């Protein structure tokens, strides 16, 4: 170095290492404890200029403050840096378009102008050469932070704490723009270009953009320019808080946001007025009308009828519906059915309720209703069965016969009606059995007819006799067929014999006629047998 220039302070290796550790540890979010020996003023200067050493110590404090601001800004902004270019339109809508840009805020916070010393006797100390590259380029500082931050570069460096996540943010447009600014050279203006009164010399003429990169370490005195810095810090804090709120609301920082479940309000539809449905469509199909409740207690229905003997004697037994449903129904007399029940072997052993059940079944099936009508009806209300009830007059007649035959065996009137109610339940079960038997018989006949049609190759469901044999198919003779009678045969024979020449030994005519008649009879019989199928034996 020249003799006229100020002598460069002899910086010990420990102080250099301290500066390196200070910058590195600040960027790595951990501060080492600074001892008194490390902050000794004598180690910065040459021991002759105490004011310069004091200024150097103050410069270290300012440096730590700058690094602290940088660390806070980086910790708040860098995790959201990849998302910054994609949410610009959203912040314009919230009125934040006038906020300073990210690079401008970092440069102003990191490299803002400090007030120069007003005393001409105190020269400004030179910035240590070891940290000049870090402070000269904000993009380089950000790049170093990105490379040294274990939260951002989890795949390249081991995190300082086992609880820190190894997250990795992909490269986006924001990072590429910062990397592009690293290639640009930033000029450093040394303190030698500033004279003792704080004015720049002619040799250090630079542009307005270069003036932002001048970092003159002053004595820490405040000036009117600090108000701008305070306003920028307030704007930075406001933008950071708005940033966090916006990202929290937009769920950018949460990979699996928990959706809020919003229950739909219940749909309230006004009741229809004057037959209208208020815009709601009716379900397809016919409208179902509610059925009136039917009293299924047959005893109450019977007791509401006129049960006098004169009225019951006027009833037509069997009921007309029985004859209409089955014209071949032949009823059995009342006295015959009563004799079958009384003269039975188990009559004396059966209870009176069982006797009433047997009497009601036989009267209903063999005299009053018949099996065909019973298979189509039941003894219950419409709310218990899809079948109609048996005619009430027939049930009243059955009640009259049971009272005439078995009433002496009951203790009182209510006991009789209780047993009659049970007998009607059994009669309804009998109707179901008859219905099932009819279906089974019909299915059995259809199965037999189908089997025969498959065997003989033709459909003959109604060509069975009572024994199950196939009836022969009779073919009707067409009226055009020539049927020969005896007169026609005789006239044809006479005309035939008239042309026959007479011989000496003439045969009597009567013999010739008999022979020809027998021949023609044999021919006719053969023709009839060929037209009709042969009779088949029992299967």
Swiss-Prot record:
PTM comment, free text: Cleaved by caspase ced-3 in vitro.
MF-aspect GO terms: double-stranded DNA binding; RNA polymerase II transcription regulatory region sequence-specific DNA binding; single-stranded DNA binding
Tissue expression: High levels in hypodermal, intestinal, body wall muscle, nerve ring, and ventral nerve cord cells of embryos and L1 animals.
Keyword NAD attributed: no
Result when mutating residue 381 to D: In sa485; alteration of vulval-gonadal synchrony
Sequence ranges of Low complexity compositional bias: 274-284
Gene ablation phenotype (knockout): Asynchrony between gonadal and vulval development. Retarded uterine uv1 cell differentiation. RNAi-mediated knockdown results in the precocious onset of tail tip retraction resulting in over-retracted and shortened adult male tails (also known as the Ore phenotype). RNAi-mediated knockdown in a ced-3 and ain-1 double mutant background reduces the percentage of animals with developmental defects including impaired egg-laying and production of ectopic seam cells. RNAi-mediated knockdown reduced the number of dauer animals in a dcap-1 mutant background.
Origin: domain of life: Eukaryota
Residue intervals passing through the bilayer: none
Free-text domain note: Despite no sequence similarity in conventional searches, based on an AlphaFold predicted structure, the sequence-specific DNA-binding region exhibits structural homology to known BEN domains, for example in human BEND3 and fruit-fly protein insensitive insv.
Protein name (record): Protein lin-14
Protein's organism: Caenorhabditis elegans
